[in-house]
Amino acid sequence: MVVVLAALMLWNEPNNLSHWNFALDPEWRGFAAMTCAAAARVRAVRPELPLVLGGISPIDVGFIRLLASYGVLAAVDRVAVHGFPLDWNHWPLADWPRKIAEIEQVANLPVWVSEAGASSFGADEIQLFGLRATARLLRGRVERLYWYSLLDLPPQWEATTRHRESEGSAYYRHYYMGLIRADGTPKPACAEFPRELGICQWFHFEDPRLEAAVDWLQRLGVQHVRTGLSWADWYRPGAEAWFDRQMQALRPFQVTLTLCYTPTALGVEPHYASPPRPEGQAEFARFAAWAAQRYAPVAPALGSLRALEPVR
């Protein structure tokens, strides 16, 4: 099955304990080896498919410099960053352009913002302000800008974070990042969402919200969608059927597909954020090549990286 893949993103937030337990890989050598191996396998089967380094959070110049020293940046076409200055980061919203410039200077690659957002935890008006200001600061500045997210997290679900204790009450901001409330009603920011921005929306295994999410994306006129497939889910019964269903539903959009989450059987420790053992690194590379072959055309509809135009 072929989907219009705009890019393949290798991992998510590799410098954040919620997604990569760097206490088990303190110099990120395991991450570098895994990413380079996956990039090589994807290049072998889909050489034209743009590869993006998983969005970093926090935005850390030193981390990008470290990965460059391992050859990771030579293996990808773009780097990505995440920022939530109104909710968790320790820098002001107005610093977005400076943050982008700092990473560009070190990476010598274009920078995507693969997650930017603001919660409605305190008030809907705060989220609306964050959307307006983020769009004003970054439209025309970056090739891709994905708003996180479309849907609020259902209150009965757990947020994907290992920082609950340190976050305190800020943990609950994770539940209010969407343009659409958990009950299906739109927030004020939804009515003003600029259709030229992308949206990042993650889906859980057999997520019942998939069809409603696609309906909202189409109503908003969104063209660019970032989502993910869980490597950990690849080994579950019915995984390929679910992956196919998810990707089939997203066919109307240009998709940046993120691959992330370690199967417990392949981790240094049995946790989705664990670095994989050496044999697991090869398995992730195999998963990445499988996803590229299954969901990307031989020559992507974007044609080449030259076709990637900044959002306006």
Where are these regions (language model features)?
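Substrate-binding cleft and catalytic face of glycoside hydrolase catalytic domains
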Residues: M1-I59, W216-R312
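Short, acidic/polar
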Residues: M1, D60-Y70, L128-A135, H204-R219, ...
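Alpha-helical structural signal in soluble globular domains
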Residues: A37-V45, L66-G71, A75, E102-V106, ...
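Aromatic- and acid-rich polysaccharide-binding/catalytic face
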Residues: V3-A6, N12, G54-G55, G62-A101, ...
